[in-house]
From Swiss-Prot:
Keywords assigned by UniProt, alphabetized: Activator, Developmental protein, DNA-binding, Homeobox, Nucleus, Phosphoprotein, Transcription, Transcription regulation
Keyword rRNA-binding: no
Family matches, as Gene3D superfamilies: Homeodomain-like (1.10.10.60)
Function, as annotated: Transcription factor involved in skull and limb development.
Organism: Bos taurus
Superkingdom, natural source: Eukaryota
Location of the motif OAR: 377-390
GO molecular function, one term: DNA-binding transcription activator activity, RNA polymerase II-specific
Lineage summary: Eukaryota, Metazoa, Chordata, Craniata, Vertebrata
The protein, known as: Homeobox protein aristaless-like 4
Amino acid sequence: MNAETCVSYCESPAAAMDAYYSPVSQSREGSSPFRAYPGGDKFSTTFLSAAAKGQGFGDAKSRARYGAGQQDPAAPLESGAGARGSFSKFQPQPPAPQPQPPAPQPHLYLQRGACKTPPDGSLKLQEGGGGHNAALQVPCYAKESSLGEPELPPDSDTVGMDSSYLSVMEAGVKGPQDRASADLPSPMEKADSESNKGKKRRNRTTFTSYQLEELEKVFQKTHYPDVYAREQLAMRTDLTEARVQVWFQNRRAKWRKRERFGQMQQVRTHFSTAYELPLLTRAENYAQIQNPSWIGNNGAASPVPACVVPCDPVPACMSPHAHPPGSGASGVTDFLSVSGAGSHVGQTHMGSLFGAAGLSPGLNGYELNGEPDRKTSSIAALRMKAKEHSAAISWAT
């Protein structure tokens, strides 16, 4: 070896192996596998820093031949741990990827117009009159969104769509509209439905006198005739069985209504007979009795009504009788006594009211002289008059 040149050994064996297998160092003509440096540069700072990084001056010179955008051919042969074939622990950051230049825009550009389906169903390119740089109007076949933009994927090629795909899309767009139109009835169908409703309405059946007579005869026998009886009646009256059945239903409803009304009238008649008619009879047929024999010790005449106590159970109250003028207390005795024991009860009551001294002789000396047949007939006559009166009131209302 020359004195001017010395062999430089790297500090780490990995760096030496890298330098041995490096194609850059082997590409020089007649160079040894070891890296040689001038003697003056052996102990310089450049040599030490290069040795520490695991590379020599030759690497920097050889890598300067490649451009900034070209790749070093030695990079694929080196390890992937280091960016430039270095096994050192000081691994530099990988270079940032360079942005790709934008692709040149073509002169012809596509414009998507309004999203309308052409009538012929084929794709047409409408070329404007602008020459080479004219725009192509490409209609879309997708469903328009609420903002007016057709809902197509951004990378779909509208020009490349074939007719089959377009026909499928067109059918998909028209399908919901056709279904919606099929669900809604047309005006003609509405008119037909209204006419059908009018036809279902049936006219009111009018019965003749003969038909009503036959129906009433059967109704007097039974209110619920069976199917056989209804069919026989329909044959006799020239009606349908359904009409006969409906007539019986209406007739039963009318009968029930009359029954309820009759019960209400009976209740009303009962109350009027029990409470109103006896009061009217008393006021019309009876008057107050003034008897001079009822004069007491003070000498004042006191008018006594005919009925002092309730007179409904007592027949004598409702039938006045003529008595001889000598018997002063005969009317009061007839009213208060029905049997022999009744006279004693009447004496007790009247004695308590007017004093026992003036009433005792007359009551004790009076003998009953009743007429039961006349009383019974008068009660029956009054009851008949009451029934006639209630019937007249019910028919008037």
